[in-house]
A protein has these predicted regions:
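Right-hand nucleic-acid polymerase module
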Residues: 1-131, 141-269
Length: 269
């Protein structure tokens, strides 16, 4: 099968990008020298499973969150466990509403977030089995940790009670905490999961280039071992540090598929 090599880059802000180099069949495909930049699809449009889910989540959080933002896990005390997945999602939505209201009262910017509800399976729910629903979130909010924790509650005034525990940590992008947290959030493959994100989040910028590499050049790099060297790819992407390399052979298209991740200092232009 005749193929050309396409490079697709997803850039998230100034400090992170993912690059795929892949064989594309020539027949029936419009080939351009360099495609114009466009934005990646929203979370709703992504197939939220496995590799696709993890990759887009990493792209999105790196485009919108950074040092000083919060990584949250919210759990339930036994007496407040939701009876259904839908109830758990409503409680998380109520928590976000309380965050917005608290920020507005304090004259602070509205919070930016990506949150997800996890727990149980449809089969377990139908059987009436216990489900340990919980929530994960990426959060940019000017409230302090104590104020955020106190909003994970039910009731008002003297009847106000905490729903469960709130685990908070500060994001450290240079240490890979955003990527690690994304992996942790989608670690369980068989539980139910629902995503929400705040309006106005920046989308990763996608760039397509069909002329940067030839099939022969990629095959030579794999054969000589250069394709597995971070320094080889860093020369092609000045100013970026290659943090992961994955090379696979596509039997159907008879070509190599290269997947790269790059990082650089956030204050780099």
């Amino acid at each position: 099968m005749r193929c050309f090599m396409r490079q697709v880059s997803w850039r998230s802000g100034k400090g992170y990008k993912q690059v795929d180099i892949m064989p594309i069949p020539i027949e029936g495909i419009h080939r351009g020298a360099r495609g114009k930049r466009r934005h990646a699809s929203s979370l709703v449009q992504q197939r939220l499973n496995g590799k696709h889910s993890r990759r887009y989540l990493v792209q999105l959080v790196n485009a919108n969150f950074g040092a000083g933002d919060w990584l949250l896990t919210l759990t339930y005390a036994p007496e407040y466990l939701p009876a259904s997945f839908e109830e758990a999602c409503r409680r998380m939505e109520n928590f976000i509403d309380r965050l917005r209201a608290a920020c507005k009262r304090a004259g602070l910017p509205a919070p930016a977030y990506i949150w997800m509800t996890e727990g149980g399976t449809e089969e377990a729910e139908a059987a009436g089995e216990a489900k340990r629903y919980h929530h994960h979130a990426f959060l940019r909010c000017a409230l302090d940790a104590r104020a955020i924790t106190e909003l994970w509650c039910t009731g008002r005034g003297k009847h106000r009670r905490p729903l469960g525990r709130v685990h908070l940590s500060l994001a450290q992008p240079e240490q890979g905490s955003l990527e690690a947290w994304a992996d942790y959030c989608i670690k369980t493959k068989h539980c139910r999961r629902k995503w929400r994100q705040s309006i106005g989040l920046k989308k990763p910028v996608v760039t397509v280039n069909d002329s940067k590499y030839t099939r022969r050049a990629i095959e030579r790099a794999v054969r000589t071992g250069e394709a597995y060297s971070p320094q080889f790819w860093e020369k092609a992407h000045p100013g970026w540090r290659c943090k992961s390399i994955r090379v696979e052979y596509n039997e159907y298209q008879r070509g190599y598929y290269v997947r790269l991740e790059f990082w650089r200092e956030r204050n780099t232009p």
